[in-house]
Amino acid sequence: MNKQSIRDIDVKGKRVFCRVDFNVPLKDGVIQDETRIQAALPTIKHLLDGGAKLVLASHLGRPKGEKKPEFSLAPVAKRLAELLGKDVPLVEEAYGPVAEEAVANLSEGDVVVLENVRFYPGETKNDPELAKGFAALADVYVNDAFGAAHRAHASTEGIAHHVDTAVAGLLMEKELEVLGKALSNPDRPFTAIIGGSKVADKIGVIDHLLDIVDTLIIGGGLSYTFSKALGHEVGTSLLEEDKLDLARQFMKKAEDKGVKFLMPVDCVITKEFGEETYVGPVDIDSIPADHMGLDIGPKTVELYADAIRESKLVVWNGPMGVFELDKYANGTKGVAQALADSDAYSIIGGGDSAAAAAKFGLADKMSHISTGGGASLEFMEGKKLPGVEALNDK
């Protein structure tokens, strides 16, 4: 990683504005999954142990620039206090006189949580005035919110231009090192597994990965567009007619580059979306006109598991089927199990793939689960992330 991190600086006695990702799911004010809070703890503890006056900032949900109590970070501040064993007050504003006074009263090793940065319309617009308001609370800026690094917002990008010292937190540093090495200097054989529902969402990542990987595996709803491009009938399965030519181009590129391009050989079909009309697996060229595929079949799972076993590095982004419904979860579960059992270094690209690994109790068997869905996807497309670019170079 060519950016400075908190390991490179002294924070003793300094006001440190740390942008974390506390965007946790809440139900009736109760945190449903605290993975993101846990992921931020090493950075928080490092800064507190170093004697920082710590100011934590995050978004939660999409309040759209209005102060809505259901999007308050109060439950997060409360949980953080329990995890750290110390007071963690919530400041009712994220900038301005109230916030400035709260920060001025901090001693070394103290921490506060600012209220949701998306309560202000200027956050998502990267308003320079709001960015300056945040910067007024800081001697040092730390970005540890990899999950929001692909967005140029006031608290993720704008603030960095108004603070002399802008560095990465430990989580951000790890994400950039793991994903960066995978893309620039991968262990081989290198396999990428791309699933999810739409080709449109994965165009950039498929295109970029075809320049790097040894094997590309396709699954999920987007695989039916590739099947159709090969001349198979896909019934009522998800199909993007306007992406058929692109699918053919990708397969041609794989051939030209000598990349093994694996696609489903069978799939699990149903007459209607749901478990009531479940039929079972059929070969990929035998989908009836009035049926749809909702998961990869057992032969495909075996094919993909073989490829995973032969790999030294595997990046997985996107499920193989509608894993939320048990009858269409076996494909995703099979791939997750193959990854868990393999010796390969496995990188799970956030979002649905991470949720699937957790659902099947296999998360702790994966080498690295990215905390950023959209951010890891854009990084794997070879794009620059605004929240990273704004940090100080080493």
Curated annotation (Swiss-Prot):
Pfam families: PGK. The keyword Ribonucleoprotein does not apply. InterPro entries: Phosphoglycerate_kinase, Phosphoglycerate_kinase_CS, Phosphoglycerate_kinase_N, Phosphoglycerate_kinase_sf. GO terms for molecular function: ADP binding; ATP binding; phosphoglycerate kinase activity. One of its GO terms (cellular component) is cytosol. Substrate binds at residues 21-23, 36, 59-62, 118, 151. It comes from the Bacteria. It is found in: Cytoplasm. Monomer. This is Phosphoglycerate kinase.
